Amino acid sequence: MNFTGSRPGGADGLRVIGTGDFSELLRLSGTHSVAAENFRAPSVHAPAQTEATTVLSFHYKDGVLIAGDRRATAGNIIMYDRADKVIDLDQDTIIAIAGSPAVAFEMARTLQTSFQYYRRSQLQALSLGAKVRALGKLIKDNLPMTMQGIGAVVPILAARDHTHQPEPSLYFYDALGAQFNAVDFAVSGSGSPAARSVLQWINRWSGNPTMQRDEKAAVQLALQLLDVAAESDSATGGVDRRSHVFPQVKVLTRDGLKSLDVETIRECFTALEAAQK
């Protein structure tokens, strides 16, 4: 590989190397995706694919909250009840995955490395728009797997550009990689219809839309939504009261990214249950 093409353009006046495109670096090095374009899955007797659901996100008073349950299933089998579906890509970007964990985790790792490679080679962070399109391209590149009914991923992305757009933005995608800016909320996964219906009612008729709620109220709402989704969808874990397994919750504000610890989430849920007595 030839990396000798240095040029000016760094944020601090230093010289940068290459284009900063991580996918170009992989192509030049002869590295290819595990999911080859010519891959063909068996038409019958394919093994049950592990799936991860449900994830949701919405705008609240201070920024964007993004949450996911912890259950991963393969057909009617519960494979794992502590799956991490909400992943930090960098200090300003969060992805929540619904679909095949194997493909989604590979996408997340690729994006983490891509963002870091661009920042180090170009001496500046990748723009918000470029991050949004980078995920869309990975989803589109996964289309052969999606069309065969395996490896589908439909994620949610929360991100901000702290230099030009400090207010967090929320995006959802379709299976072809098209991205959409979510004004109020975004949901994905098999339990999403129930969560979507509740969020639509809250924002339209409750008189207390999500954008008016503080962080604690937003976290409590996310826990309620995932618990409601779990009532009608066996692939959604919700809140496991017996094992004390709680959903993942992260928030993205003007001040940056924050992961809520288990104890904070537990306190929010305990307060909810106490209010019902």
Residue spans for each PLM region:
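Long, low-complexity N-terminal extensions
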Residues: 1-277
